[in-house]
């Protein structure tokens, strides 16, 4: 029988090896308790090390953001379904600040403010994230706004131009066409996208804040119909969402846009609308028992919007030269632009496009009030061709509005005033556009130039839009060389301008107004009638035009 021997050295070595390789499967967590909850706000005790804006995890994987850091408890906004959060439940720290996934995979998708897809098209694969609260580009990291961003809307591109990197406010009462103007600007980027050149392409982000779900679906359908979802991301926080989602949605949109901007790409972000974000933030602040100020808004509501809109920039060439252009929308009540939120955002932005309900109801659409709409970037954000032809347009329209108001009380007007009223009425017609029908910059330059030359003066006001549409179709055929020379917004030279006028004069000879009249002067009409040999006799009313 073998003798059993036990070596103390072997036992000691085995124990040492085991203890050296042992790693305890334990983690240290800070856990707090919900003390009370209501309307998407929870107060949590027992998390002394929590940071401002840190993500907290509630039962069921629901997230919250720590906003109030008091001595004994935390005030948190719940992001998601807050109805199942109850007093006494455990809350854990995550150690992370709120961030969203970013990248080209988001193009063509509809997401919520947490970056999660809500369009039923599957998960979005992205390996990169970006924090929602980041410092905007510094002064030295920027360059002046000089590159135009064409909206396809004649009244904006001619009189209140928008540049890449600008913040242009769209403001007006409800149902005045604010969303339609911004969607047109998105649709107009399709031609740039199809070039495949990243220096021309503009990626678009539409942020819907507090809109009806059906309205957001309508916007998505309009973008899909025109093929614009290919380069667009929709961040949706509909009216049914909690106040926390409505508060965060604009920051999510700008974070996704900033990612592309720092890659040297161009981005357009539409915030529709920031009034509802401010109202959501007011609700959150009041529930967190923060002291209210003017109109019950908290004291930092200005900072809410300024830190968001300051992220718009045209980066320096050293950082890639990318840009983030913002079109924030603000809803007014009874055209009152002096209310708290409108004045705040007007002071932050680089200009505003004011849409007036009276003009809208008169059929002037887009209903842009030329008098108080302004772009602080101005001609620097216009192409040479547009700058050359639109110089006097704004002044003429402003004078027309003033004279129109005066003429309502005047019994008799001199010939010059009548001529100015006639010209102004035709300019107003010329600037009207159908919804979702952006116009290429070349057509805009031609139309505005010919209007300045008096080509439309002999056209009845009711026929101006039909005359313009048929004229542009004809010029594309007969003056294609002119269009080629002004492609991309280049300036009209004297020879091309002369060719345009000559081609237009020929077209006018064939155009018949809806009342049967010719749009040429009396002598030209007589000559044309005399030359109609072998044709059926037509009784033509002649429009007398004083040139």
Swiss-Prot record:
A Pfam family this chain is assigned to: ATP-synt_ab_C
| Cellular component GO terms held in the UniProt record | plasma membrane; proton-transporting ATP synthase complex
Q: What GO molecular function annotations does the UniProt record carry, in alphabetical order?
A: ADP binding; ATP binding; proton-transporting ATP synthase activity, rotational mechanism
Instruction: Name the EC number(s).
Output: 7.1.2.2
Q: Where in the cell is it found?
A: Cell membrane
Record-marked site positions (Required for activity)? 373
Membrane topology annotation: Peripheral membrane protein
Query: Catalytic activity, per the record?
Result: ATP + H2O + 4 H(+)(in) = ADP + phosphate + 5 H(+)(out)
* UniProt keyword annotations, A-Z: ATP synthesis, ATP-binding, Cell membrane, CF(1), Hydrogen ion transport, Ion transport, Membrane, Nucleotide-binding, Translocase, Transport
Q: What is its main location?
A: membrane
Entry-linked SUPFAM superfamilies:
C-terminal domain of alpha and beta subunits of F1 ATP synthase, N-terminal domain of alpha and beta subunits of F1 ATP synthase, P-loop containing nucleoside triphosphate hydrolases
Q: Where does ATP bind?
A: 172-179
Q: What does this protein do?
A: Produces ATP from ADP in the presence of a proton gradient across the membrane. The alpha chain is a regulatory subunit.
Q: Which family does it belong to?
A: Belongs to the ATPase alpha/beta chains family.
Q: Which PANTHER family match?
A: ATP SYNTHASE SUBUNIT ALPHA, MITOCHONDRIAL
- Quote the subunit structure annotation: F-type ATPases have 2 components, CF(1) - the catalytic core - and CF(0) - the membrane proton channel. CF(1) has five subunits: alpha(3), beta(3), gamma(1), delta(1), epsilon(1). CF(0) has three main subunits: a(1), b(2) and c(9-12). The alpha and beta chains form an alternating ring which encloses part of the gamma chain. CF(1) is attached to CF(0) by a central stalk formed by the gamma and epsilon chains, while a peripheral stalk is formed by the delta and b chains.
Descriptive protein name: ATP synthase subunit alpha
Organism, scientific name: Rhodococcus jostii (strain RHA1)
